[in-house]
Amino acid sequence: MDAIPAVRQPQIQLPITVQLPKIRVPAALSDPRLVQILSLGILLGAGVFVRDFSIRPAQIILTFLFALTTQALCWRLEPNKPRSLRSAIITSLSLSLLLRADNLLAHPIAAAAAISSKSLLRFRGKHLFNPATFGLIFALLVLPGSWVSPGQWGQDVAIAGWVVAFGMLVTNRVHRGDISWTFLFFYGGGLAMRVAYLGQRWAVWTHQLENGAILLFAFFMISDPMTGPNARRGRVAHAALVATIAYWWQFHLYAFNGLIWALFIAAPAVPLWDAIWPARKFEWTQNGGDHEIVHASKTAPCDCRDCSRDAVRAA
């Protein structure tokens, strides 16, 4: 009997690995402020066309015009600082989202005051107040016919979800999500205790936290890296302080605009937190990298995630 020839097994060839060239994103496009501008712009567009915000196109145009013009004038006071209009655009969008007035002058004047405060009200190299917050308080105190309308957002779950999503994109890029979530923890905890004390249904609590104004404040205002504490522990303490003042303002004084007033009143405490917990100051850089911390101080430690990873690798 003839022998059966052996069956030759086919050879399996592994796929060839092709290494694609790395695509470098231009430095200007990796700036987190562009993400914030896009997010606020989408929210403003949704508010105007979906929520029917009571703001006229002329008010928005004048807000941008006066903010950008004031920023250009302020550069004369600080000729050595890097020049960028992105922060002024963010302030203009924030004022357009929150400020309401029955005349055309309130918005541009508030915008000019907000941008001017960055150059005039400074302490140890940092501007003291969040520009949008200062502009809102200035309008409420000085400009008649002005008000802040937090109720315009309603309690729409979809809008709340988009605000949180956009906010997380921004805060993660600048490593400031800790202050946003800490504020929501303390403020939400105060609301929860009040609901329990009054014997209300927990649907009231979730209804309050779904307010777009609270989420916009948490992710786009208190998280401002230029006016917040430098150290993580300072940011946690500051968020707790702002949440406490906001709760006291709203539920003990029964006054309006507790969030805005709380951030304004607590602003002078930021230098105190920086003195207790020294850390390197945040600065916007021109390289547009994911790490936006300028190591200006050689003695103060930096507690951001990138520096922590570098320290572990060095050890």
Locate each region found by the language model:
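Structural signature of hydrophobic alpha-helical transmembrane segments
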Residues: 52-65, 98-109, 146-161, 204-214
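Membrane-interface helix-loop-helix junctions at boundaries between adjacent transmembrane segments
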Residues: 80-154
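Internal active-site segments that recognize and position negatively charged phosphoryl groups
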Residues: 143-200
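N-terminal signal-anchor module of multipass membrane proteins
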Residues: 2-75
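Central hydrophobic cores of alpha-helical transmembrane segments
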Residues: 132-136, 180-189, 235-243
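C-terminal transmembrane helix-loop-helix hairpin of multi-pass membrane proteins
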Residues: 15-38, 190-297, 302-304, 315
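Hydrophobic, membrane-inserted alpha-helices
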Residues: 40-46, 67-71, 87-96, 110-117, ...
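C-terminal ends of transmembrane helices
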Residues: 68-80, 113-127, 165-175, 219-229
